[in-house]
C-alpha cells in the first residue's frame, strides 16, 4: 500500500489575510540540475502523496510544465484547485512589470489565481545567458516599494 502524508497533520500558518498556508511544501527550483520534465514528475508525485503547497517561480523556467501537471492532477481528481496553495515570484528583471510578470505566471501555470506572489529577490539584476550567477548589471539598485511598485 502506498503511503501518503497525513494532510491534517501538516502544520499550517495563518497569513495576515486569515488564509492558511501549509508550513511544508514542495519547491520547484531544480532547473540547474534537473529537467523541467523531472521537476514535473516530482510535482505530480508530491501532490499525489499529500503535498498541498507548491512553490514556483518564473525564473525556474518550468512553470509551463508545472501548469500541465496541475491540469493533470485536477483532471485525474487527485486534488481540486482549492486544496492547493500555489506560490510564485517576480524575478529581478521584472520589478517594474510586476503585473505583467504575474499574468505570465498565471498563464504558464494555467491558473486564474496564485495564492501568494513574492518578490523573489529584492535587487534588480540582469543575467545574460551563460553568465556567472554573481554577475550584476552595473545599473542595478536595491529594491524599494516606492521605486518599483
Language model features with spans:
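N-terminal binding-site loop/beta-alpha segment at the start of enzyme catalytic domains
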Residues: 1-84, 99, 112
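A short, structured active-site edge motif that brings together acidic residues
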Residues: 80-94, 115-122
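Short, contiguous strand/loop micro-motifs
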Residues: 28-30, 89, 142
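Generic structural signal for short, solvent-exposed loop/turn connectors between secondary structure elements
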Residues: 62, 89-100, 148
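Short, surface-exposed alpha-helical recognition segments that flank or form part
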Residues: 34, 57, 93, 143-147
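Feature marks short, surface-exposed loop/turn motifs that line or immediately flank catalytic pockets
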Residues: 30-33, 60, 92-94, 120-125
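Glycine/proline-rich, positively charged
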Residues: 99-149
Amino acid at each position: 500500500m502506498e503511503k501518503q502524508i497525513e494532510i491534517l497533520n501538516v502544520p499550517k500558518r495563518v497569513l495576515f489575510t486569515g488564509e492558511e498556508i501549509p508550513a511544508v511544501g514542495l519547491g520547484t527550483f531544480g532547473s540547474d540540475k534537473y529537467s523541467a520534465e523531472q521537476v514535473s514528475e516530482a510535482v505530480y508525485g508530491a501532490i499525489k502523496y499529500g503535498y498541498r503547497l507548491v512553490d514556483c517561480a518564473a525564473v525556474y523556467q518550468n512553470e509551463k510544465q508545472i501548469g500541465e501537471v496541475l491540469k493533470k492532477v485536477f483532471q485525474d481528481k487527485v486534488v481540486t484547485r482549492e486544496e492547493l496553495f500555489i506560490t510564485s515570484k517576480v524575478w529581478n528583471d521584472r520589478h517594474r512589470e510586476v503585473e505583467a510578470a504575474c499574468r505570465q505566471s498565471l498563464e504558464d501555470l494555467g491558473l486564474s489565481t496564485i495564492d501568494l506572489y513574492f518578490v523573489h529577490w529584492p535587487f534588480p539584476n540582469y543575467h545574460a545567458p551563460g553568465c556567472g550567477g554573481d554577475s550584476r548589471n552595473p545599473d542595478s539598485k536595491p529594491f524599494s516599494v516606492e521605486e518599483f511598485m
